[in-house]
UniProtKB/Swiss-Prot annotation:
GO MF annotation: an example: protein serine/threonine kinase activity
NCBIfam families: PRK11768.1
Gene that encodes it: rdoA
UniProt keyword terms in alphabetical order: ATP-binding, Cytoplasm, Kinase, Magnesium, Metal-binding, Nucleotide-binding, Phosphoprotein, Serine/threonine-protein kinase, Stress response, Transferase
InterPro entries, A to Z: Aminoglycoside_PTrfase, Kinase-like_dom_sf, SrkA/RdoA
Pfam families assigned to the protein according to its UniProt record, in alphabetical order: APH
Active site positions, chain numbering: 201, 217
Organism field: Salmonella typhimurium (strain LT2 / SGSC1412 / ATCC 700720)
Induction of synthesis: Expression is growth phase dependent and sensitive to the media conditions reaching high levels in stationary phase (at protein level). It is probably regulated by the CpxRA two-component regulatory system.
Protein name: Serine/threonine protein kinase RdoA
Length: 328
């Protein structure tokens, strides 16, 4: 069974509690599901009133070696005093198994939502991203992939071609817009950037604030350019994004060098994320959680909007990239 066909319907509460009991943890509260579609994540409290989070990984998405690399990276970051949510070890192992599922247990870490429009918080995030990347540069991932065109563009293009859920009246226009976008990204893409281990999905929703930033969810960690962990923090118009990026880079460079030439990768990376995310939704459609939570995916209007989004992103790729002020 591949990861596209898999569902979590056999992951019952009793199965979860049995898995935790095997590690010496008695659940003394209910299992509260947290927002995660790719995996299944639950918060709970044990009999000593300690709070934990347990994460059950979607089978076949990542190999055991790839998940262990993610965990090792998180533990390295903690050792280097970078604030991340890292898995706990049981008998020396962070990746655990029960009834065919792989899972990990984390301490439950509370915090407020990171405020992307707060300049002080943005500076702190930039500084800690510099430290995170210092650790990331020590060595690359061996088993986890690099960010590249095949995974983020060409494989999704085939998913779109094969997808039965795209309305027939919209498919031709959508595929045409996709092909035009892919060509534009390919023209802009560079492979001469330095790569390092990244958080990979560093947006505001994966940063908590507790007297400073706390990075969570390294599930998408990959090798790639440093800018991948910066651009998703930007929002607003170009002037606002320029100010935000300058704030991040200035703080980042207090602890780590940043190649400003990578700024030209922001819009190609944005396009790649748009394409990859849409293909991900289609791939996961067999999981009942997806039709339930994304019912609009089969609608004509939705695919019209996606076609327009791809056309607009293609236009942006033909414009000059974001420019920093001359002091940079």
């Amino acid at each position: 069974m591949n990861d596209n066909a898999f569902t979590f319907q056999t992951l019952h509460p009793e199965t979860i509690m049995d898995a935790l009991f095997e590690q010496g943890i008695m659940v003394d509260s209910g299992l509260t599901p947290l927002n995660s579609y790719e995996n299944r994540v639950y918060q709970f409290q044990d009999e000593d009133r300690r709070r934990f989070v347990v994460k059950f990984y979607r089978p076949e998405r990542w190999s055991v070696d790839q998940i262990r690399e993610e965990h090792q990276f998180a533990l390295e970051l903690v050792k280097d005093e970078v604030p991340v949510a890292a898995p706990l070890a049981f008998n020396g192992q962070t990746l655990l198994a029960h009834q065919g599922y792989h899972y990990a247990i984390f301490p439950s870490v509370g915090g407020r939502q990171f405020e992307a429009d707060n300049i002080d918080q943005m500076e702190a995030v930039g500084r800690y991203l510099g430290r995170l990347h210092q650790t990331g540069r020590k060595r690359p991932f061996t088993f986890r992939p690099d960010i590249g065109l095949a995974e983020y563009l060409f494989e999704p293009r085939q998913v779109f071609e094969d997808a039965a859920l795209i309305p027939s009246g919209q498919k031709a226009a959508f595929l045409k817009a996709t092909d035009t976008l892919l060509s534009a990204v390919t023209e802009c893409w560079r492979t001469d950037f330095a790569t390092l281990r990244l958080h990979g999905d560093c947006h505001a929703g994966n940063i908590l604030w507790r007297d400073g930033p706390l990075f969570v969810d390294l599930d998408d960690a990959r090798n790639g350019p440093a800018i991948q962990d910066l651009w998703m923090l930007l929002n607003g118009d170009k002037a606002e994004q320029r100010m935000q990026l300058e704030t991040i880079i200035e703080a980042y460079e207090e602890v780590s060098e940043f190649d400003t030439a990578e700024i030209g990768l922001i819009e190609p990376l944005r396009a790649m994320r748009l394409v990859y995310y849409l293909a991900w939704l289609i791939r996961r459609w067999g999981d009942p959680a997806f039709p339930k939570n994304f019912p609009w995916l089969t609608g004509e209007d939705y695919w019209q909007r996606q076609t327009t989004t791809f056309i607009e992103q293609t236009k942006i790729l033909h414009e000059p990239p974001l420019q920093l002020t001359p002091m940079y």
